[in-house]
């Protein structure tokens, strides 16, 4: 009989803990609903990332091989690129 009482007490503690956790979760979700509206940026066209993307790409394509890197990976990559160019011509 005492095991039934102990089991009932343990179950009631578990239920209380679950209720407390649910209340905490509800409160935290309610607090997350609030957000701040930020003002819209009014940048000139030349200052945006999208407008600079073309020039950024051209710089990368023109200058990517200017840096001398002499390690195994780079050498294998260059050899693979040369082989790919030969096979697809």
Swiss-Prot record:
The answer to whether the entry has keyword 4Fe-4S is: no
List the Pfam families hit by this protein, alphabetically: DSS1_SEM1
Q: Which GO terms describe its molecular function?
A: molecular adaptor activity; protein folding chaperone
Q: Which residues carry this modification: Phosphoserine?
A: 12
Q: Which CDD domains match?
A: DSS1_Sem1
Q: What happens when the gene is disrupted?
A: Impairs mRNA export and transcription elongation, and induces strong transcription-associated hyperrecombination phenotypes.
Similarity comment:
Belongs to the DSS1/SEM1 family.
Q: Anything else the record notes?
A: Present with 5590 molecules/cell in log phase SD medium.
- Its protein name is 26S proteasome complex subunit SEM1
Protein species of origin = Saccharomyces cerevisiae (strain ATCC 204508 / S288c)
């Amino acid at each position: 009989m005492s095991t039934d009482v102990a089991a009932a007490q343990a179950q009631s503690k578990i239920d209380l803990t679950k209720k407390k956790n649910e209340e905490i979760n509800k409160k935290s979700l309610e607090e997350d609903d609030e957000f701040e509206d930020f003002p819209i940026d009014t940048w000139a066209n030349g200052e945006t990332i999208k407008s600079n993307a073309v020039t950024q790409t051209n710089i990368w394509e023109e200058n990517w091989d200017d840096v001398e890197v002499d390690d195994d990976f780079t050498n294998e990559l260059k050899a693979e690129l040369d082989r790919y160019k030969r096979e697809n011509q």
